[in-house]
UniProtKB/Swiss-Prot annotation:
This is Serine hydroxymethyltransferase, cytosolic. It comes from Homo sapiens (Human). Its cofactor is pyridoxal 5'-phosphate. Inhibited by tetrahydrofolate concentrations above 40 uM. Pathway: One-carbon metabolism; tetrahydrofolate interconversion. Homotetramer. Identified in complex with ABRAXAS2 and the other subunits of the BRISC complex, at least composed of ABRAXAS2, BRCC3/BRCC36, BABAM2 and BABAM1/NBA1.
Amino acid sequence: MTMPVNGAHKDADLWSSHDKMLAQPLKDSDVEVYNIIKKESNRQRVGLELIASENFASRAVLEALGSCLNNKYSEGYPGQRYYGGTEFIDELETLCQKRALQAYKLDPQCWGVNVQPYSGSPANFAVYTALVEPHGRIMGLDLPDGGHLTHGFMTDKKKISATSIFFESMPYKVNPDTGYINYDQLEENARLFHPKLIIAGTSCYSRNLEYARLRKIADENGAYLMADMAHISGLVAAGVVPSPFEHCHVVTTTTHKTLRGCRAGMIFYRKGVKSVDPKTGKEILYNLESLINSAVFPGLQGGPHNHAIAGVAVALKQAMTLEFKVYQHQVVANCRALSEALTELGYKIVTGGSDNHLILVDLRSKGTDGGRAEKVLEACSIACNKNTCPGDRSALRPSGLRLGTPALTSRGLLEKDFQKVAHFIHRGIELTLQIQSDTGVRATLKEFKERLAGDKYQAAVQALREEVESFASLFPLPGLPDF
């Protein structure tokens, strides 16, 4: 491109074309990307979304996410930026912090919040960086038992998560017979391991956590207690499940699951008086704020994603409405309806049910596994994910399916609708068993998928898919009207 000279451009047509490019809508500017988005939008519209960590953000959240706030750099914190022109960014971040505390009914004298983490994993790692020295000890629920990768997962042969690479982690487990967390074993192991931090958080656990018990164990070992409420943050805001804030020192969360915002993260931390020195009577204050803020920036991140902070602020405002509370109660009611319907159809639900938004279906009694069932259901426009069950010997062939109700509840499905969803799932698993019988139990997943894609089963797959898509299309999809 020829550079402008004395305020005029030598190639006015080219410069005009440049201006036009900046003003073009996506469908004209990039047809390939636009078509991919349209295809994904249609997949979401005609499919049944049962992945427990997914939801449908509101139009308002998506509009904030696609705003001019994407353009602004703002390293630092409100009132302490490394760039000029941040007065409105400061206003936005302060508003988001205020709403975050209000949404969880927290006293700003006792709690603070950092809303800059890019997502949940960076938020968790920032807390570890702030509170646990390198190679310090942490304890989290084991991934195969329902924990999260960032809680320190490793195998016998390899440290998988960065958490397990830079810190020493010891997992706690569930009772393989009941599926419930074994708090007695956790207490015993904590006495031997002496962790600096205990994580109260899950990614596939259908029961409420015993925060008081976990805090007692943490106190006995001089450890911090951190809750990772990423999956249940919307339920907590609505008062549908117990709040971790009463017992925890730090609480992290994502904002796009049950909270139904955009993809981002938050870290809540205690502040104010921690204790009183019994000898001097002097108040001892928490120092978590400076440690955590420094770990987020400049420790691990650069400039915050201001468009995402705006989306979070919008979601938090929505989370304080009566409509949101009604929605969260329906999420739990729908999950119980799904669990009961599948139980009646002969399926085993780990822990026997659910207190929250998800269930884990154990397919071992059916003679199949989650990987095969997931592929068949996906071919029938039902999205869910394979997951390990308590007692599984290999994560490469997990026995379970994780099913969640937040996304479909956002579309307006009620208990009776989830009973129908359960029957769709059942028919998909019955088809899985037919294909598995045809291929043999020793067949690899690749061989199973090849048989699934063959002509023999396409009529059955298509018939179920058409029923699913016809049913799903009855319910509106939240979001932007153009997609």
